[in-house]
Amino acid sequence: MAKDKQSNDELGIQDLHREKTQQIITKPDLDYLEEGFIICSNCGCRIFLEDNPPLSISKCRECSNSNFIPLLIKDFWLYEPLGGGGMGSVYHSFFRQNSNVEAALKVLPRKMKNDNFLIESLIGEARSGSKFSNHPHLTKVYEYGLWEDEYYAAYEFIDGIRLDQIIESPVKRPDKQILLWALQILSAEQHIYDSGFLFRDLKPQNVMIDKNGNVKMIDYGLAITVQDALSGSNAENILGSPHYMPPERIVGAPESQYSEIYSLGMLLFHMISRQTFYSSEDIKHLVEKHVVSLRMNNPMMKLPANTNPELVRIVCKMINRNPSARYQTYKELGAELFREFKKTA
């Protein structure tokens, strides 16, 4: 589904993107890197790579300015940190033959790069993602493996902003934008399911909005096969964000599309109300609440009074504590969301 550029500008997505872009380091001079040095961003002094540990911060000997030391892995220069992702650290990277080709490379923290559990987590995430990531609203897995002594996974670099940053921004998003993003997430979820997997980690931090205003889902660390989800074979590992995790995961019950629909419902609630359904204090007792089957507070009482009643009804059904009372398939939910999307100005 195409996104209208004008409405994108009206929503301030482009402004948020420009603010973020101003903070990003310029593209590297590949000739310098291939010759074994970088240029201090403050004084222009040469800093030789061989004199510094890779992926570390080095102080310039002339001006004491802090500079990041890149690392070459296969065909990519890891050039600047992007942050943490699951079990690894993620770096903005550039193809060594062409700095216009970008990627996000995930590697293990320096002190744990030989940890077998972390290695399997890093490679396992990329292996799973490679089976379903070829979709316009999913971050593509380019390649993964072992290069010299480094395990790595190369992903599509998303030039955008995380959804949690958008939710926290001063501008409230209109229903039509929220519904569009929900439909794009559903499209990605359907593709993942059709490929034999469940995503299982839907939260604002794992949804990027690219510079064109469209969804890109990231981080496949909790994805498991549909078969494993239905069998409950992963029940001993209660992983995920408590604010968005379906209650059936907490009690070790089977998961399916209705579980992802619950997580999307909690995400929709967060986007509409600009607060999570459960407070931080609630989270401390959330497991106990689900186990003893305490009744969930009425979502209608927690959403803004001027919220579209049909959207309230849809969200309430999505986050029903009882899986059988929710929408059972992405297609069923998608039909209702799309109907509201067409009606919404």
How should each PLM-predicted stretch be described?
Residues 181-182:
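Activation segment signature within eukaryotic-like protein kinase domains
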Residues 144:
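Activation-segment/catalytic-loop signature of the eukaryotic protein kinase fold
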Residues 187-197:
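Protein kinase catalytic-loop region centered on the HRD/HxD motif
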Residues 112-131:
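AlphaC helix of the eukaryotic protein kinase fold
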